Design a protein with these regions (language model features):
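Helical "substrate-binding/catalytic lid" subdomain
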Residues: 4-68
Length: 68
């Protein structure tokens, strides 16, 4: 159980930081394409949220979703 708790802590503790890096990169691309930064951030964050929801609710492996 202790080992599982360490893995859970690593994923849940570090995971959001990686999500924020991806959101920032997507938003930067949106700004370079001409979107206002606030809108680009909102779109990128909603994309990340929707993707996470799809991954949880579909039951498919993330690689399957990526390849669709």
């Amino acid at each position: 159980m202790k080992k599982a708790l360490q893995a859970i802590t690593a994923i849940s503790g570090c995971g959001p930081g990686y999500c924020f890096v991806i959101i920032d990169a997507l938003a930067d691309a949106g700004v370079r394409a001409g979107l206002p930064r606030a809108l680009a951030i909102k779109l990128a964050a909603q994309t990340m949220a929707g993707s996470g929801k799809l991954c949880v609710e579909s039951g498919l492996h993330p690689a399957q979703l990526r390849d669709q």
